[in-house]
A protein has these predicted regions:
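Glycoside hydrolase catalytic-domain context in secreted enzymes
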Residues: 1-231
Length: 231
């Protein structure tokens, strides 16, 4: 039932050009104590047969959905462009879980992310961790080397630090960036983008905080001014 419901939602969203983060991968069947902070978390133990036939099956069903059509603009030999259509996987995004599988955090589990998800199921998309800002055990380096794409985090001291002199950092960083860009490119996020287009980013969190601080202050000043004018 889980697989059927998730598959239906993922496929219909994909037909509209959306990518859907299927979660939480995997064996995350309880909310209590799944991630109590720092190094504490639920550790799930199971045999391989049960994992494959029960706990991974809904995710596998999503990964093996029929492909969907995507419209795009194709460059011609004469330099002109025309509308074209291709097929893409219906499921291109996934979120890992807080818990451990055995003693290994699911979001940094090589056999799960690279062995099964990317290797056996042929998944090429975006793998993100569950949201956390302080959990030391959810190591970003472990995540990226296991086959993950990015961490859903907000504190600088928990983010992946790229070493420009490290060959392995370039290797894993390139693979992670490719999976993210692949997912975005194969969605309606790039709809209408042509050579020469200018992509404008959204405001940063700092800009938004400044705006949300100044705007109420200005409204308060105007309100006080109107009150005193009435009197």
């Amino acid at each position: 039932m889980s697989g059927s419901m998730a598959s239906a939602a993922v496929q219909e969203a994909a037909k509209k050009g959306l990518y859907t983060f299927v979660k939480h991968f995997a064996l995350n069947d309880q909310e209590n104590h799944r991630g109590d902070g720092q190094d504490a978390a639920a550790a799930t133990w199971s045999g391989e047969q049960a994992i494959r036939e029960i706990y991974l099956k809904p995710f596998e069903m999503c990964m093996k959905l029929d492909p969907v059509e995507l419209n795009y603009v194709e460059k011609q030999d004469d330099g002109s462009y025309k509308n074209a259509t291709t097929t893409i996987p219906a499921c291109n995004a996934l979120m890992t879980s807080f818990n451990r599988i055995g003693v290994t955090w699911a979001g940094g589990h090589y056999n799960l992310l690279t062995g099964v998800l990317r290797g056996e199921w042929g998944f090429n998309g975006f793998v993100i961790t569950d949201a956390n800002g302080y959990l030391g055990r959810m190591d970003p380096r472990q995540m990226i080397e296991a086959g993950g794409s990015g961490s859903l985090r907000y504190l600088k001291d928990t983010q992946f630090t790229f070493d420009k002199d490290s060959v392995s950092d370039y290797h894993y960083g390139r693979k992670a960036a490719h999976s993210i860009l692949y997912t975005i490119a194969n969605s309606k996020a790039m709809n209408g983008a042509m050579p020469g287009s200018t992509l404008v980013g959204t405001p940063t969190d700092k800009q938004l905080r400044v705006l949300l601080t100044i705007l109420p202050a200005l409204l308060l000043v105007l309100l006080v001014y109107r009150i005193f004018r009435v009197w």
